[in-house]
Swiss-Prot record:
Entry keyword set: Cytoplasm, Initiation factor, Protein biosynthesis, RNA-binding, Translation regulation
Start and end residues of each MIF4G domain: 209-434
Protein function: Component of the protein complex eIF4F, which is involved in the recognition of the mRNA cap, ATP-dependent unwinding of 5'-terminal secondary structure and recruitment of mRNA to the ribosome.
Name under which the protein is recorded: Probable eukaryotic translation initiation factor 4 gamma homolog
Biased composition (Acidic residues): 66-79
Protein's organism: Vairimorpha ceranae (strain BRL01)
Molecular function as annotated in GO: mRNA binding; translation initiation factor activity
Chain intervals for the UniProt region annotation (Disordered): 65-86
Subunit record text: Component of the eIF4F complex, which composition varies with external and internal environmental conditions.
InterPro entries reported for this sequence: ARM-type_fold, MIF4G-like_typ-3
Record's GO cellular component terms: eukaryotic translation initiation factor 4F complex
Lineage, broadest ranks: Eukaryota, Fungi, Fungi incertae sedis, Microsporidia, Nosematidae
Length: 598
């Protein structure tokens, strides 16, 4: 029997260590944005500097008595007295000799000057401190202050007098005496003086940009209404300033993707009202701000060819591994920045579409171009579009176009890398959960039992039934055509779009008949208050394109006027809409006739 080798069993023990403290970075649109919006001014407490005190060698502070009680030796006092006596005698002898030959009145001033000059010469010839040795230090300092004083009436001494003090004394400066506070007229604030606003000297563009940037930096879900009102209150003067703010919002939406939806809400709120003073005189429907947001976002997509250089770097072209790694990092950094910029613009356009700020017409041309380009990056951009706006396209009855893009992505997903392939599969899986449009009308007669239709005995009855069915089909097509005109008016962007829509009047009048089409058109305006807001002004502005005479229009209005009493039961606003339409039409006709006469 062969001896079996015993096997060693290893037991792996894993112990979970819970970290004591973790740091997480959280960016929530409901929280305050402290980093990007710091306080205007930060008040810091300043420590008062310590007082400088003169001390004796033993460490005790010097007092005023110590300054005045400094005495000299007896020998110095004797030499000082001898010098004073000798100086006085020499001066007296010189004065007597000069006065003998002159009168007292003429020589009085000269004598005083000679005495002062002789005293100064004697003092300078000897030691400079000998003549002042016996004087107190307090007196010496006061004499020095008198030499430099401005007003002779103000005494300078250590102890303040009744005269108002305008400066500190020597004792107060040396901290021998507590300082007495005094007021200077130079430091008083003039109440009547108008304060100078230094911001007025800045350029208006800089102040507006600073205010707008400051408001956008504070943007969150909680304060978005207040920030929109603050932005509307900005006094924008030129079109260039409005364009700069539009580019600023696009830049911030690209670099701050977590707040992109909020920036789209700001654009939607400022779409029509955010105009500069220069734009008010031009009378344009589209604002420069909104046009700049669209053009700058679309320009990012138009300039997108490749996010970065996709060629593979050859290691043999570099000297060492360090240079190769540095070149590879630069390539990946450039790729990341371009990808971030492109997808940021896609997010902004998708959010604008989801908020009904723009329509599919604004981005459909660029999507059609992407469908004709076979590129991994383009496929990823299309997937991003469908992921963001696919459900909204279904709700807006654009499901055919969304399904076409989804089928294109499904067909080409196997051509690219696994990352793109799995991303497209995730997007297509989300399609199952998209909401479908729900019809608002309900079938009120669903519970009733349908009866069999009676047989048509005669050919005349059969012919009448065919004519009735044809008229019903024509009326349905008429309503569908009018509804398409209304949808086109909702999506109209400029006056040029409305001119193109007005061409439908000619096509519809030729196919359905002029009278039948416009009678149905006006009945839709009267019975539907929501549609009348767009359809009625549109007919008034483009009445010349309808090929209707005023007499024909008068007959159509009279027919609807007879039905108003019946329509008021189901449509209470029909009479109001009818009167507004007639008044607006008459005013428009009269204004044009007056203009032609003038």
């Amino acid at each position: 029997m062969v001896n079996e080798v015993p096997t060693l069993k290893k037991k792996i023990i894993f112990k979970y260590f819970k970290p004591l403290l973790t740091f997480t970075k959280k960016e929530d649109p409901y929280e305050l944005r402290v980093k990007s919006a710091p306080p205007l001014n930060i008040i810091e407490e300043r420590k008062e500097p310590k007082k400088f005190v003169l001390c004796k060698p033993d460490g005790t502070p010097i007092t005023l008595d110590d300054l005045s009680d400094i005495s000299d030796s007896e020998e110095e006092e004797d030499t000082k007295l001898d010098m004073k006596d000798s100086i006085k005698e020499d001066v007296k002898d010189s004065i007597k000799e000069d006065v003998k030959d002159s009168s007292k009145e003429d020589v009085k001033d000269d004598v005083i000057e000679d005495v002062k000059g002789s005293i100064n010469e004697e003092i300078n010839s000897t030691c400079g401190t000998c003549s002042f040795i016996n004087l107190k230090r307090e007196k010496i300092l006061n004499e020095l202050l008198e030499m430099y004083r401005v007003e002779e009436s103000v005494p300078y001494s250590f102890v303040p007098t009744n005269v108002p003090q305008i400066m500190y004394s020597v004792g107060e400066i040396l901290n021998c005496i507590n300082k007495i506070p005094f007021t200077l007229k130079l430091l008083k604030k003039d109440v009547n003086k108008i304060p100078v606003n230094y911001k007025e000297f800045k350029i208006n563009k800089e102040t507006i940009i600073e205010k707008a940037t400051f408001e956008l930096n504070k943007l969150t879900n909680t304060n978005i209404k207040r920030i929109i009102t603050n932005l509307k209150n900005l006094n924008i003067e030129t079109i260039q300033q409005a364009k700069y703010l539009g580019n600023l919002i696009v830049f911030k939406a690209i670099n701050e993707p977590q707040y992109c939806n909020l920036y789209a809400m700001v654009v939607g709120a400022l779409k029509k009202d955010f105009k500069s003073k220069e734009e008010l005189g031009l009378h344009k429907k589209q604002t420069a701000f909104f046009g700049t947001v669209l053009t700058s976002a679309m320009k990012v997509l138009e300039e997108k060819v490749e996010w970065a250089d996709t060629k593979v770097l050859d290691k043999n072209l570099y000297k060492n591994a360090f240079e190769y790694e540095r070149a590879f990092e630069e390539q990946e950094t450039e790729r990341y920045l371009r990808k971030k910029k492109t997808l940021g613009a896609v997010n902004l356009l998708c959010d604008l579409y989801n908020l009904d700020v723009i329509t599919l017409k604004h981005i459909q041309s660029r999507l059609n171009e992407f469908l004709n380009i076979e590129n991994e990056e383009v496929v990823e951009v299309l997937g991003k579009f469908i992921e963001k706006i696919g459900e909204k396209m279904y709700l807006n009855d654009k499901s055919d176009y969304a399904n076409m893009i989804c089928s294109y992505l499904d067909a080409c997903k196997n051509k690219y890398s696994n990352r793109v392939k799995f991303y497209i599969m995730d997007v297509l899986d989300k399609k199952k959960n998209w909401k479908k449009p729900v019809s608002k009308t309900e079938n009120l007669f669903s519970s009733l039992i349908m009866e069999d239709e009676p047989a048509l005995d005669t050919p005349y009855q059969y012919q009448e039934q065919v004519i009735a069915n044809e008229e019903e089909e024509d009326s349905l097509e008429l309503l569908k055509t009018i509804d398409n005109i209304y949808q086109d008016l909702k999506d109209a962007y400029d006056e040029e779009d409305e001119i193109m829509i007005a061409d439908n009047f000619k096509i519809a009048s030729n196919t359905f008949g002029k009278i039948s089409f416009f009678s149905t058109y006006f009945s839709e305006c009267i019975t539907n208050s929501r549609k009348s807001k767009l359809l009625v002004p549109f007919v008034i502005n483009f009445f010349n394109e309808t090929n209707l005479n005023e007499s024909e229009l008068f007959d159509i209005i009279n027919k609807h006027k007879e039905k108003l009493n019946e329509l008021k039961i189901d449509f209470p606003l029909s009479q109001k809409i009818m009167s507004l339409y007639v008044i607006n039409f008459v005013v428009d006709r009269l204004s044009k006739k007056i203009h032609m006469i003038n």
